[in-house]
Each structure stands twice: as C-alpha cells, then as structure tokens.
C-alpha cells in the first residue's frame, strides 16, 4: 500500500518543495533535507509572498475558528425537535461543553498550521485523538508525511503517514509490540537515531462489530519500515483525520491545488527582479571606479577620509563608472508583481 501511494505522489513533491521555498520556508524539507535550526530563507529576496500567505492564514483562523467567540452551533435535523425548548437547551449545553473541550486542547495552535499548509500546498491533514484525560488532541501533519486515497464519492477515505521516531521511544509508544532483535539492538546502541514508522488508516472491508479494537470500521496499522515489523494493529470507529483540499483541478487528481500555486510564477519573477534591482542599486550607491593606468600610487583607498596620492601635473582623476541603470522602472515592475501576488491571496479584500 505504501509503495503504491508513494509512486502516485512523487510528481507532486518537486512542486511542493518549490512552493515551500518561496511561501513557507520553515516547511521546505520535502525533497531537500535540512538540519534543525538552519536558515531556510536563502532563496527569498522579497517577503511579499510569505506575508500574503500569513495574512490569509490568520484571516481564515479569525473568521472560521475564532479564539474569543463561539465558532460553531448545533442544530437538530428534525424540525419537530427544533421547536422543543427543552431539547434546544440540552443542545446548547452540549455546544458549550464542546467549546470548553476545544479550548482546553491544542486545537488553535494546530488549526493555524493547517491553514498554512492548505494555502501553500493545497492539501493538509490533521489527526484527532484523545489523551489519558479524555481531552481531544490535534496534530497537523507535514505534507511530506502523508499519502492519501479517496473513494468513489471523492472523499478521502485512507491516509498513510510516514514519520520519524527516536529509537528510545519505540518501546514507550508500542509497549505491547513484540520487538525483534534488530529493533532492540538499535534501541540499545543508537537510542537517539530516528526509526521510520509507517502508520496506515483505511476502511475495514469486513467489520465485525465493536467487541475489540481490531474489528472497527477503520483499520489502523503501525509498521517499522526497516524490519517490516507490525508494531500495532487496532482500529477506529470513525476516520481520525481531517483532510481539507483547497481546490481540485480534475477528477483524476487526489491532492489539492492552492492559491500559492497560482502565485508561484509571479513570486519567482519578483524574486529575480528584486535580486537584479538590489545589484543595480548597489552599483549606483557604490559604483565601480575607473582608475587611470598611470599617475596614481597604489593602493587606491575608497574608505571615508582615505588619502590617495597622484603625480602632480596630471589631469587624470578617479571617476565612477556610469552604468545607466533605471531603478524606477525596476521598482515599478516589482510593484506589478507584488499586486498580482496579493490578489491571489485576497489581500486587498482582507485589508478593507
């Protein structure tokens, strides 16, 4: 299953990497691997694209999942129940309890990440689980980790996740697993190195009821990639992932498309223009110098207050090279590209 899904997704990976380089550099580790803590903005010469994505993400968070006001209500489908005052009071109390549960959880932090990935890559995924205190826990997954499929209705019905886990944490995360000698050896000798775990959730074709967690509607399997060891087999009553997709260009594409994809040509052009304009401005502010080949005693000192000696009687002088650059034209063209990028992220509408 994993190998098939990986082969289907490979054409997207270079596209996602390029998007992350320009729009979301902190997540630019899809086909390129970065050391934790290193700089990620080396290709960015203009921050318009990253700022536009941040602004739209914050706006979606404020409009759809506001932190200071209720962002959902519960209603009955049955019209008769909707006219019952006691039933409505009960439903309102349920909504308040749900809001309290969301407030206690890490939902706001993770949904903000979800909006960023959705607007940049067009697809994002959030895992929903409960902890020992029966509170909800949310985790937004990096686009590089997920492999999805959809059913005949166009809904995502399976997700396979490939993630890293420290060897020393394998026993704690999978206490009931029968670990082979190879994994135990890695835990003992290389506890701080990463193991690769594959977690797949997919529909159970033959559910047999809820008498145990292996007979539920959704199968959940955790496999150690290096050894192929099945670490855990369980299930879910409901699909535990939320997988929004911004837009789909055609019915044969499973992964979504994003406003960042529309803005990518303008963003790449703007970065190239900015790099050129910076060089042109540097040449005007600190221009190349034309020095006569005779009459001056080297070295030439261009620092403030520097003394330069030349032979008396000569009319030769050190002069700046006139490069004839037109900075206003370059700046005007950059503004055109900035406007196009902002329009893709609806910045004008958000700022009014």
Question: What spans do the regions from the language model cover?
Answer:
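Extended, helix-rich architectural segments
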Residues: 1-193
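A generic structural signal for short, solvent-exposed coil/turn residues
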Residues: 118, 138-140, 189-190, 213, ...
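Flexible loop/turn segments at secondary-structure boundaries
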Residues: 133-136, 205-209, 228-230, 351-352
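Secondary-structure transition/turn motif
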Residues: 141-145, 160-165, 202, 222-228, ...
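Membrane-proximal cytosolic interface modules of multi-pass membrane proteins
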Residues: 194-199, 203-204
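Extended, non-transmembrane interaction/recognition domains
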Residues: 202, 211-215
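Extended, charged amphipathic alpha-helical segments
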Residues: 217-352
């Amino acid at each position: 299953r994993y190998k098939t899904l990986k082969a289907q997704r490979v054409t997207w990976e270079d596209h996602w990497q390029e998007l992350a380089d320009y729009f979301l550099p902190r997540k630019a580790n899809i086909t390129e691997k970065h050391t934790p803590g290193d700089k990620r903005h080396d290709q960015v010469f203009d921050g318009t694209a990253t700022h536009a994505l941040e602004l739209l993400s914050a706006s979606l968070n404020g409009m759809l999942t506001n932190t200071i006001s209720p962002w959902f209500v519960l209603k009955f489908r049955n019209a008769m129940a909707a006219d019952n005052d006691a039933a409505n009071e009960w439903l309102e109390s349920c909504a308040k309890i749900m809001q309290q549960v969301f407030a206690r959880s890490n939902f706001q932090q993770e949904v903000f990440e979800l909006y960023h990935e959705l607007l940049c890559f067009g697809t994002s995924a959030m895992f929903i689980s409960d902890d020992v205190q029966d509170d909800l826990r949310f985790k937004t997954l990096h686009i590089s980790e997920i492999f999805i499929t959809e059913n005949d209705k166009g809904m995502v019905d399976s997700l396979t996740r490939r993630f890293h886990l420290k060897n020393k944490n394998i026993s704690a995360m999978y206490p009931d697993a029968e670990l082979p000698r190879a994994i135990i050896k890695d835990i003992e000798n290389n506890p701080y190195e990463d193991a690769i775990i594959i977690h797949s959730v997919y529909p159970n074709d033959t559910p047999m009821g809820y008498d145990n967690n292996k007979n539920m509607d959704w199968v959940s399997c955790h496999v150690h990639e290096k050894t192929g060891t099945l670490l855990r087999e369980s299930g879910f009553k409901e699909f535990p992932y939320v997988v929004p997709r911004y837009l789909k260009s055609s019915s044969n594409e499973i992964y979504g498309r994003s406003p960042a994809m529309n803005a990518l040509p303008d963003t790449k052009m703007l970065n190239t223009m900015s790099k050129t304009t910076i060089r042109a401005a540097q040449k005007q502010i600190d221009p190349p110098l034309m020095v006569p080949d005779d009459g001056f005693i080297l070295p030439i000192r261009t620092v403030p207050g520097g003394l330069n000696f030349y032979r008396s009687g000569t009319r030769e002088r050190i002069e700046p090279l006139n490069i004839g650059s037109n900075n206003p034209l370059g700046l005007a063209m950059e503004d055109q590209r900035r406007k196009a990028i902002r329009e893709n992220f609806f910045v004008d509408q958000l700022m009014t």
